[in-house]
């Protein structure tokens, strides 16, 4: 059985787990478990020799479990193999802990991960020439995928536009005050699709 593991010091690695035959082993190596591992490093496919469960985050609900599948797909698509990234590891771990405890909406859980993940891979949502002081709370803004947010000037730009007050809440990291998280998430979805050459993020459509 081949597993993809996100590690703190080596990034995303592929390991071959020989001898994983029992139901207990399969259960132990389910997604979203923090493991202590030993492995023999190989160029392409390392050999897993030992694992120990440190935390199984068993309080994660089924809905958030599906959200984790989406996060896994993003990491698999956009994080290169064997490229160390402690920030990505910490983001993922912190979010798994968060999902095991929170009563937030599923959109909020997605949104928090997405904006931080985009920042970590170098594609943070940008403002073009706008700044917080120049944003009119009563106007609408659309996202130009080449330069960032711009003020809406015509009807075409109204599609997937953001109210000025929501944009300011986003910039001030007051995410719980944003009324239209879904439109922000459509923008983020489009960014991911552009980064993947138009390929769909399959698990996005689970919700």
How would you label these PLM feature ranges?
Residues 1, 6-207:
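Non-catalytic alpha-helical scaffolds and adjoining flexible linkers that form interface surfaces
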């Amino acid at each position: 059985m081949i597993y993809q593991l996100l590690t703190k010091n080596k990034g995303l690695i592929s390991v071959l787990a020989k001898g994983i035959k029992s139901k207990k082993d399969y259960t132990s190596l389910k997604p979203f478990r923090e493991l202590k591992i030993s492995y023999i490093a190989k160029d392409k496919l390392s050999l897993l020799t030992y694992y120990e469960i440190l935390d199984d985050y068993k309080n994660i609900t089924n809905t958030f479990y599906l959200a984790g599948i989406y996060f896994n797909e993003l990491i698999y698509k956009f994080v290169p193999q064997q490229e160390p990234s402690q920030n990505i590891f910490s983001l993922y771990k912190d979010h798994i802990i968060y999902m095991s405890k929170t009563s937030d909406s599923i959109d909020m859980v997605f949104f928090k991960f997405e904006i931080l993940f985009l920042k970590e891979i170098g594609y943070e949502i940008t403002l073009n020439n706008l700044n917080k002081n120049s944003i009119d709370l009563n106007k609408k803004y659309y996202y130009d995928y080449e330069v960032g947010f711009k003020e809406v000037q015509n009807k075409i730009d109204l599609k997937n536009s953001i109210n000025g007050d929501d944009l300011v809440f986003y910039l001030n990291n007051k995410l719980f005050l944003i009324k239209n998280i879904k439109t922000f998430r459509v923008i983020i979805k489009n960014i991911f699709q552009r980064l993947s050459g138009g390929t769909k993020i399959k698990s996005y459509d689970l919700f």
